[in-house]
Amino acid sequence: MRRAAPSGTTARHATNPLRNRNQGIPIVATSIEQSFVKQFQTEVHESYQRLGSKLRPTVRSKTGVKGASTVFQRVGKGVAGTKARHGAVPVMNLEHEPVECFLADYYAGDWIDKLDELKINHDERAVIANAGAYALGRKTDELIIAALDAASREAVGAGAGQTDGDGLTKQKILLAFEMMGAADIPDDGQRFAVIGWKQWSDLLQIPEFANAEYIGDDELPWKGTQAKRWLGTLWMPHSGLTLNGTLRYCYWYHRTAIGHAVGAEVQTDITWHGERAAWFVNNMMSQGAALIDPEGV
């Protein structure tokens, strides 16, 4: 049944539910399509796993942390002893030292204009997703590198007439190798060495590292520049290591020497801002890192 509009009001105005009665301004919808949100969140998470941190897999990582900090336990060495017949078993009295790791929140956000995807030839969502993944991945590595910097043991002054400015020489590597062994660092396949790209080039000049006569065809570094196993250690180049003047810090460590804590994995929040006609994409995470055992670095 058709109803007539009240006197003095046109039917067009009476049947428009999107018009503000006080100001005469159309109400703008502020919701974003759920399919777009879900697709974007998936892209960010997958990109972080693929393109993110290089160092996180090399350290002891704890996920699902509740609170602003967590504790990693460092246990001392035990000593075995004998006992008399029917006597008491000697007690090792292992030292337990808690190492607290503080977490911090990190963000990587950017804007996506509603009409940008109609004007550009590339996938803007993929670009923002990759950029956020790289930023968060670099921050994870920065936290781990800062924890490595807290260690104090250094392999310096190796070889007669050599200085720290001579690059990464075989003598320095062997000195560090001896220090790892003297400290009883387990040779269990969980040793890692992270060096700069210049130092990676120095390694390629060492026959024992790059010559098939020493290491065989399967371990040649020329097949890929990401990582290579040598001396029971996985070696990898990294561009974000600490630079002190002209000296690049390189690190040789055991996985259990560094602790990495995760309170929140990479998350994505997308909100619509009508005054900008754009979405703001905020990628965020909560993480921290700490030096657990200085002897292991």
Show which residues each predicted segment covers.
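Walker A (P-loop) phosphate-binding loop of ABC-type ATPase nucleotide-binding domains
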Residues: 8
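Alpha-helical scaffold segments that mediate packing/assembly in large oligomeric complexes
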Residues: 115-183
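Extended, solvent-exposed, turn-rich assembly/linker loops in the middle of proteins
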Residues: 153-226
